[in-house]
Amino acid sequence: VSERNDHSSNTVNSASQPATEQQEQVRAGNNSSPATTIAIVGGAGDLAKKLLLPGIAEYAAMSGTNVRIIGADMADDVDYPAYFAAALEASGTPTETLSSLIAQSTYFQVDATSAADLQKLMDVATEQQVAGPILYFALPPMITARALKALEGVKLPDGVVLALEKPIGESLETARAVNEQLAKLVGEEQIFRVDHFLGLSGTVNIEGLRASNMLIDPIWNAQHIDEVRIVFNETIGLEDRAAFYDKTGAAVDMIQSHLIQVMSHVLADEDTSPSEILRMSKAVEARRGRYTAGTVGGKELPSYVDEPGVEPSRNTETWARIQLAVDTDRWRGIPIILESGKGIGHPRREISAVFRQTQDGAPANVLRLSFESDELGIEVNANDPSDPDASEWNARITLSSGLVPSKLGAYGRVARSLLTGEKHLRLTAAAAEEGWRIIEPVLESYDSLPLEEYEAGTTPGQ
């Protein structure tokens, strides 16, 4: 049974809504409202090009917000308007918004670890600036840490916002050091620790479904649920990321950086915050694996150890699964499974809850929320209508529905939070540290934990 509700009564057709004054100004190419400056350190890198710049453009197009972008990086000659245009080429950004953003974009060569360079960048960022600019570090964690140290020698303008990508640090100790350094520079309300997974559809939707539906909220607990599983598997291999990934692995790259934080929001409620969920969580089991040569989606993928830039002796895992125990009244006693891997055949990217079986032994009901496709599915048992004499279940049915389509992607939501001061997607200092506290015992266990092998294109851990 499949039902898609694309015409829900609370679906907003943006085309039929009157444009805001700012949107009309953007369309006319003469938005005179004060621009908010976002200076992106690492602005010529992959993250900026593939995710952040398209996200900013997406939100600017929706809201009419006037944004000025300064790309800052080590390269000495970057045509940033052309770079920006290339980044947005496939994004579907309206021409008017694209023209406005490109016209206001500039490039600044900077060594992120130089106080003198960062001071010059701040001077440029505060030109014609009413509110404090946003200084966004789209850099590897330890370069960000060095940049924050360099900011001690920079006169930061009032209201400046410091935004930094996860992971925060490379360990619990270094995460604490980064948080201590941030606290020396600005107040907590001026710090934005970015985890775009909190802006993915699945994470956003599960919170609303639980809190707003009597069908779900009363049974969203260990009394009625047997297992919660959060999975983000990928078909891709390294994709030229060996320099980063081979020193990191699946457990840190995905589970520590993202899925642990998603878990805290999935399990939180009005009485227990995500931070409290994290404090009450610990890892109790772990598995890991590494892909060998195989075929994924018709594409040959070499063995991980044969990928350029990989050092086989590191024994880096490309797939990790951990089981958590969460010691709260609502969740005590059931497994919380977090899993992520690369080179996976038929990958799942979802949040799922497996409910307890009924007394008649029928298969358990399962609720599934896709991370990316705005879809909800519920697996239930029913009678087969072709067998009217059946007195018990004899058919398995999946009820599925498209949710209200998202107006913004994950980085569009990040941009909205940055530009409006919304706090939902901001990680606290404690949350960033708790992620490391939870994962470090897992990493320590790897010395004695077998490194399983799975053929690329298959599903490990079966």
Task: Give the label of every model feature segment.
Residues 2-163, 168-462:
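Secretory/organelle targeting and membrane-embedding segments
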